[in-house]
């Protein structure tokens, strides 16, 4: 088997459904499997997987083990040559795995491969490629200076070596994952991807950012970035520095102080979301509306012009995931547009209008 996709889920039933549909669509020419580890969700995630995706291997836990342990549990069951660690609030294109695996097979000193992530509004997520967060770099980031935190030396569309990749999408050989013993389970949430990336480059292997493939990451859906995030960030960095840096005490104190200040910076920088002025469905089907959608809706087959303040709904019943992502990615950043996807054979649309807030699910009648 070539690939095992491991998805750790916690209470994101509808985002998980969309994610799984996109992953299955990307398996056309690949011998692959999907493993979903559920961290004791209280929604209908598990029943949905059993009903709609019977081929998916579902591992149901009786408590929330956190990101590291949950993913490690999934990898134990994996059979693929490669492992893809994938967040449940992501959407991939039909050729994502085909392209990235072809590239991976050509590398002779491969560590981990990451790819270009965009949020629900089509904006590039800079954490897709990062530098090692040394104590000083982290302190600068906490106080608003991210220049050295992100790997800006590499353009978002380029491919090249970087230090740190993001846990929302990581491709790694299963043999290497097992050699480094996977994610460090001392981390509950945040920091585990930094730690894994750092351990791999310390082995002399190359972590590579693959800018030719784009994945939507509805960042903020699983956890809100607030005071809890600040505390977890501090705890994660404390573990990382204690493990990898000597004489970290002073930096530990500074990071702790910064983590107390961070929520005030974040609360002042929260993105303002505006209500859409118009709603447009892009579909090649012969339909006039979406049953159960309560707002005025126009239907078009193709976007000819970008209308500011419009919410565009993409119909996955007639458009491929790659087509949808290309159109979202093609919007200018100042378009003030928002986007949602109607998954194939589903009665809901979903999306996220901000990378700092929870995603939104809108329920429909059967269409």
Residue ranges, per PLM feature:
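Short aromatic/hydrophobic "clamp" motif used to bind/position activated sugar donors
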Residues: 83
């Amino acid at each position: 088997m070539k690939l095992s996709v491991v998805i750790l889920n916690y209470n994101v039933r509808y985002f998980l459904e969309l994610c799984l549909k996109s992953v299955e669509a990307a398996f056309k020419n690949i011998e692959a499997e999907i493993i979903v580890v559920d961290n004791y969700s209280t929604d209908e995630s598990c029943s949905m997987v059993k009903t709609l995706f019977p081929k998916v291997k579902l591992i149901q836990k009786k408590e929330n083990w956190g990101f590291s342990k949950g993913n490690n549990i999934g990898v134990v069951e994996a059979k693929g040559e490669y492992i893809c660690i994938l967040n449940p609030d992501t959407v991939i294109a039909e050729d994502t795995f085909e392209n990235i695996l072809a590239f991976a097979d050509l590398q002779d000193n491969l560590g981990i491969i990451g790819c270009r992530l965009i949020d629900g509004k089509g904006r590039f997520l800079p954490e897709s490629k990062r530098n090692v967060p040394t104590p000083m770099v982290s302190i600068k980031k906490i106080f608003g200076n991210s220049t050295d935190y992100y790997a800006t030396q590499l353009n978002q569309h380029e491919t090249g070596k970087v230090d740190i990749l993001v846990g929302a999408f990581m491709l790694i050989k299963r043999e290497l994952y097992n050699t480094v013993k996977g994610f460090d389970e001392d981390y509950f949430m945040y920091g585990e991807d930094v730690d894994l990336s750092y351990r791999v480059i310390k082995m002399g292997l190359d972590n590579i950012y693959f800018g030719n493939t784009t994945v939507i990451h509805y960042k903020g859906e699983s956890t809100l970035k607030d005071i809890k995030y600040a505390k977890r960030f501090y705890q994660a960095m404390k573990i990382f520095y204690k493990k990898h840096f000597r004489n970290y005490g002073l930096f530990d104190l500074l990071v702790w102080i910064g983590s107390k200040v961070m929520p005030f910076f974040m609360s002042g920088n929260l993105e303002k979301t505006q209500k859409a002025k118009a709603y447009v469905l892009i579909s090649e089907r012969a339909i006039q509306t979406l049953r159960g959608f309560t707002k005025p809706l126009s239907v078009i087959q193709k976007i000819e012009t970008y209308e500011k303040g419009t919410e565009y709904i993409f119909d996955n019943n007639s458009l491929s995931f790659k087509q949808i992502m290309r159109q979202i990615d093609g919007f200018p950043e100042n378009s003030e547009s928002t986007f949602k996807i109607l998954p194939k054979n589903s009665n809901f649309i979903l999306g996220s209008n901000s990378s700092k807030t929870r995603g939104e699910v809108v329920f429909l009648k059967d269409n």
